[in-house]
Amino acid sequence: MKKFIILTPLIVLLTICVFCIIYLLSNKDPLKPPSALLNKDLPLFESKSLYDLDKVIKTNDFKNKKVLINFFASWCLPCKVEHPLFFTLSEDHQDLFILGFNHKDNIEDAKKYLADDGNPYSFVGIDSDGMIALEFGVFGLPETFLINEDGKIIYKFMGPLTKEIIENELEPLL
């Protein structure tokens, strides 16, 4: 009976260790949770242009186009870190439509940010109330999505993109 009492916690601990090792070897990144939107249709949205409130962009405007969607804000420091990379993407993939959604930001602050740092986007939409981000399941800024020509979300990245992430994860899909 004494042996059983001593061995039981050891067996439980060993079992927990085995499950932890199996999980760690499964190559799942806990910082990169799967998106429920992957391989789903692009959510329906309509957004006014940051620069011309009479111009509107809609989900239907992207039929047969590859689209990179980036949610950003002028007050978002990680957004500023990844910002220059969108210029490179724009130059390297001229057929790629890069849509920036300015999220819960002051319009004048957003315009100043893009005037100072440059505008790499094909179109900048306004998401002042956060409803478009909600449709995309945006958790925090920045977040980036890649949509294929069939209108399906094929890639999502939470956080600032880096050269390595673009080269290893995004480029193969472009």
Which residue ranges define each predicted feature?
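N-terminal targeting signals for export/organelle localization
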Residues: 1-48
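Short extracytoplasmic
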Residues: 40-67
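A generic structural signal for alpha->beta connector loops
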Residues: 44, 95, 121-122
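Short active-site neighborhood of thiol/selenol oxidoreductases, capturing the structured segment around
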Residues: 57-80, 86
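Conserved N-terminal glycine/acidic-rich loop preference
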Residues: 63-66, 110, 120
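Structural microenvironment flanking redox-active thiols in thiol-disulfide oxidoreductases
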Residues: 81-118, 128-135
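Thiol/disulfide oxidoreductase modules built on the thioredoxin-like
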Residues: 115-120, 127-174
